[in-house]
Amino acid sequence: MAAPSLASYDGSAGVLVDTNIWVDCIDSESAWHNWAVEQLQACSEKSPLHINLIIYTELLVPEPDVHALDALLDVYDTQRSPLPWSCGALAAKAFGLYRRRGGARLLPLPDFFIGAHAAVANLTVLTRDRAGYVTYFPRLAVLAPEVLGG
């Protein structure tokens, strides 16, 4: 399988919602709760929201409540999107860059797969961790708070 071409990437096929946004939406005590809910609402009115198996799994740890999670995702008509095989090569490439820059992890982190999924599926990422994505996926369209740490 050839590495995916991102020549036509513009993030216009929808929004892949990162784990931290869903966590903030669930946690009414989070400093980011209102922002997360506002972003989910605004994004869902403009384009389809997406979640993949990695994000879904992260949201079920430590206490799985599949019914509650599915109900929340359904509120925003969130599509459960499969990881395309082509994102494997892109995630590996990004992870290689991470290792060359001194990253200590020996196996790719979930965000590498999430970023690669967004890139090959032409999705924008909604997250609080802009730097974590644009560092390794510089062409990726990212919606994040415009503050330190966002």
Model regions and ranges:
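Active-site neighborhoods of divalent-metal-dependent phosphate/nucleic-acid chemistry enzymes
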Residues: A2-D10, Q79-T124, R128
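Short, well-structured N-terminal submotif of metal-dependent ribonuclease cores
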Residues: M1-I51, V61-A71, L143, G150
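Conserved glycosyltransferase catalytic-site signature
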Residues: T19, L53, P110-F112, R130
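Active-site-proximal, substrate-binding regions of enzyme catalytic domains
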Residues: P64-S86
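Short, structured coil segments at secondary-structure junctions
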Residues: Y76, Y136-P138
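A general structural signal for well-ordered alpha-helical segments in protein cores
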Residues: N52, Y56, V66-L69, G88-A92, ...
